[in-house]
């Protein structure tokens, strides 16, 4: 398959923090137009892997290629949207001002209303971020990540604190973005969230334990539930 089919190519990536391996020889490929889930417990290495995709973490071994360019490459970041676990917002600015600022960074003046409507915050656009609830800040952070219509969208625990009804709507939106060719990487430790992805990478202790569709992973583990598959492939006995 041609390289330009892939939005992300990770080959043998390793990274340690002190003596602790955060990533241990991870290799994976993510296609354009694919929703790919990184599933694992807290501390598994999901965030470190995502940060390596935007050049915030430099691997000690291996290579990271994003949208056909070896990372880190500043020019690539204009085509990438990144939503961190902790909302990276300016608390004294309004929701609209935050989204407009992040759009301007990427040279995009339009799309602010569309992004805020996507996360159902247009009616609160004039609210100062410091007055918003945690869930609303999460949604504002998501709007900032997608306002410039990126080719690759990286979402680190994107629906924490978001109510179930809006979560469904957001996922419908992610699906439409993927259908338009955007590659989306979602990290999560929640099983029902992971089941919405086209393919999954199961991560524990910095290692990629298994990769494939939900059905393929369940079949490989010989179980009916994704949670049981993760435990079995992790070498942990289900109680």
Question: What kind of region is each of these model predictions?
Answer:
Residues 54:
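Helix-to-loop junction immediately C-terminal to a conserved catalytic motif
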Residues 62-76:
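Conserved ABC transporter NBD signature motif
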Residues 100, 104-124:
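Conserved ABC ATPase "signature" region
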Residues 153-157:
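Catalytic Walker B motif of ABC-type/P-loop ATPase nucleotide-binding domains
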Residues 211-212:
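ABC ATPase "signature
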């Amino acid at each position: 398959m041609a390289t330009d089919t892939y939005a992300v190519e990770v080959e043998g990536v390793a990274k340690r923090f002190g003596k602790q391996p955060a990533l241990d020889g991870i290799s994976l490929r993510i296609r354009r137009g694919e929703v790919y889930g990184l599933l694992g417990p807290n501390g598994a290495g999901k965030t470190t892997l995502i940060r390596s995709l935007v050049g915030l973490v430099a691997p000690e071994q291996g290579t990271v290629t994003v949208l056909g360019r070896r990372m880190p490459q500043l020019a690539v970041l204009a085509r990438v949207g990144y939503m961190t676990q902790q909302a990276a917002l300016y608390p004294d600015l309004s929701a609209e001002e935050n989204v407009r600022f992040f759009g301007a960074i990427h040279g995009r003046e339009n799309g602010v209303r569309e992004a805020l409507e996507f996360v159902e915050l247009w009616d609160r656009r004039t609210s100062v971020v410091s007055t918003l609830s945690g869930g609303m800040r999460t949604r504002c952070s998501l709007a900032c990540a997608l306002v410039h219509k990126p080719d690759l969208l990286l979402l680190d625990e994107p629906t924490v604190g978001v109510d179930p009804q809006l979560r469904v709507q957001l996922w419908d939106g992610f699906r439409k973005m993927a259908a338009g060719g955007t590659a989306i990487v979602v990290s999560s430790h929640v099983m029902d969230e992971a089941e919405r992805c086209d393919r999954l990478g199961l991560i524990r202790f910095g290692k990629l334990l298994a990769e494939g569709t939900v059905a393929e992973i369940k079949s490989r583990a010989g179980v009916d539930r994704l949670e049981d598959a993760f435990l079995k492939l992790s070498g942990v006995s289900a109680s």
